[in-house]
C-alpha cells in the first residue's frame, strides 16, 4: 500500500507540471531541497559552525533548530548530514560536496524557486508519514510526454531514488528485493494496480524461459538471474566465433 501511495504522489507531481506546461526536469528531483537554504557550496554542513547553520532552512524548507550541532545536522536532508571526506585519503580531503551533488542541489532549488506557487499543495503530500528518504527522490528517464503517465512505464525503487523508464527497458536484476522492477499497468487478482516482476518474467528477460526449475525464493531467483548472462547474447557471440 505504501509503495502504491508513493507512486500516486509522484504521478500527481507529473500531473501538476503537465497542467501548467512545465517540462519535467531532466536531472534527478530531490524534493527535500524544495525550500532549503542551508549553505552547500564551499564547506559542507558537516564542517560548518552552528552559527553558519543558524537561521537557515533544511529539509523541505523547515527551520534548522536544536541544542547541538547534531540537532542542526539532523534538520538537513540525509545526504547533506555526513562527512563527505570520510571515504577520501588525507591528501584528497576537500571538506566540500562533490561537484555533481552541488549541481543537483542547485538545479533542484532553482526548479522549486521557479515553480513553488504550483507545488505548495503537493509539498504536503511528499512529506507524509511513511515516505522513506529515497522515495522523496525521483528520476524520469522517459523524455517528453504531453501527458506523462507513470503507470505505463517500468518503475524501480532504488537507494538513489525512484527511477522511471520506458517499458522497452528493464533495469538490472539485483539481489535486493526492494529494487525488483515494478510493472504498474498490470491489475492483480485482488484488483490492485501494479505488481513486482515475477521470477518467471526475470527468467524470460535472460532468455531462460525454458528452464524447468527456478530458485524457490524471490531473493535467490533474482540473485541468480542478476549474475547470469543472457542466453541469446551468448549464443550470438558463439555463432560468430
Model-assigned labels for residue ranges:
Residues 1-58, 63:
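Flexible, glycine-/basic-rich loop-and-beta segments that form/coincide
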Residues 36-241:
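C-terminal target-recognition/interaction regions appended to catalytic cores
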